[in-house]
């Protein structure tokens, strides 16, 4: 008779445990019910990126001293720096600077270690093209400042999503 009672007690404990697990899952589901959807209508609405967002690299040709620190700290040796040594002034003169964003991993090492701060990260993240060769940006394309999302009048920006008050 006692084995039957212990089996009935185990069955009761398992039932209570299962009900508790179902209740925990249901509470998590209910906690998410008050939140607004995370998805946005992408081409027409854009989220404002954070200050530390690592987007396309901006390059200032006049500040660059062709020291090639960016190439040495890049984990994939990506920036291509062409320079010529000016013998009369004993300095390097930058001829060409390019970065292939099809290969870039956007780690930000080049920006962090640049001694003259000629490199910076922008908030531009729309770099998609139909041809991968168009992702190879020269100093002219790198020097172009992107239009700020905040200043774009055709797009509704989402600064802070309003919360539902209960």
Swiss-Prot record:
Keywords of the record: 4Fe-4S, Chloroplast, Iron, Iron-sulfur, Membrane, Metal-binding, NAD, NADP, Plastid, Plastoquinone, Quinone, Repeat, Thylakoid, Translocase
Cellular compartment(s): Plastid, Chloroplast thylakoid membrane
Of the GO CC terms on this record, one is: chloroplast thylakoid membrane
Sites where the protein binds [4Fe-4S] cluster 2: 74, 104, 107, 110
Cofactor annotation comment? Binds 2 [4Fe-4S] clusters per subunit.
In this chain the 4Fe-4S ferredoxin-type domain maps to 55-84, 95-124
Membrane topology value: Peripheral membrane protein
So which residues are the signal peptide here? none
Thylakoid in keyword set = yes
Which terms in the Gene Ontology molecular function aspect does this entry carry? 4 iron, 4 sulfur cluster binding; iron ion binding; NADH dehydrogenase (ubiquinone) activity; quinone binding
Any one Gene Ontology BP term:
photosynthesis, light reaction
What are its E.C. numbers?
7.1.1.-
The enzyme's first-digit EC class, named in words, is translocase
Q: Tell me yes or no: is Translocase among this UniProt entry's keywords.
A: yes
Identify the cofactor(s). Answer: [4Fe-4S] cluster
The reactions it catalyses are: a plastoquinone + NADH + (n+1) H(+)(in) = a plastoquinol + NAD(+) + n H(+)(out); a plastoquinone + NADPH + (n+1) H(+)(in) = a plastoquinol + NADP(+) + n H(+)(out)
Chain sites annotated for binding [4Fe-4S] cluster 1: 64, 67, 70, 114
Q: Which family does it belong to?
A: Belongs to the complex I 23 kDa subunit family.
| Described purpose of this protein according to its UniProt entry | NDH shuttles electrons from NAD(P)H:plastoquinone, via FMN and iron-sulfur (Fe-S) centers, to quinones in the photosynthetic chain and possibly in a chloroplast respiratory chain. The immediate electron acceptor for the enzyme in this species is believed to be plastoquinone. Couples the redox reaction to proton translocation, and thus conserves the redox energy in a proton gradient.
Quaternary structure (record):
NDH is composed of at least 16 different subunits, 5 of which are encoded in the nucleus.
Designated name of the protein = NAD(P)H-quinone oxidoreductase subunit I, chloroplastic
**The species this protein was found in:** Melampodium leucanthum
Q: Which gene encodes it?
A: ndhI
């Amino acid at each position: 008779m006692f084995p039957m009672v212990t089996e009935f007690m185990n069955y009761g404990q398992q039932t209570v445990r299962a009900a508790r697990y179902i209740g925990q899952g249901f509470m998590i589901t209910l906690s998410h019910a008050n939140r607004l959807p995370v998805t946005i209508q992408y081409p027409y609405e854009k989220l404002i990126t954070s200050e530390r967002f690592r987007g396309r690299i901006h390059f200032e040709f006049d500040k660059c001293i062709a020291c090639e620190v960016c190439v040495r700290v890049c984990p994939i040796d990506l920036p291509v720096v062409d320079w010529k040594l000016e013998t009369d002034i004993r300095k390097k003169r930058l001829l060409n600077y390019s970065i292939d964003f099809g290969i870039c991993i956007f780690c930000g090492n080049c920006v962090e270690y640049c001694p003259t701060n000629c490199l910076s990260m922008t908030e531009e993240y729309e770099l998609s093209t139909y041809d991968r060769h168009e992702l190879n940006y020269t100093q002219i394309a790198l020097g172009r400042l992107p239009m700020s999302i905040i200043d774009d009048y055709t797009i509704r920006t989402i600064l802070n999503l309003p919360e539902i008050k209960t």
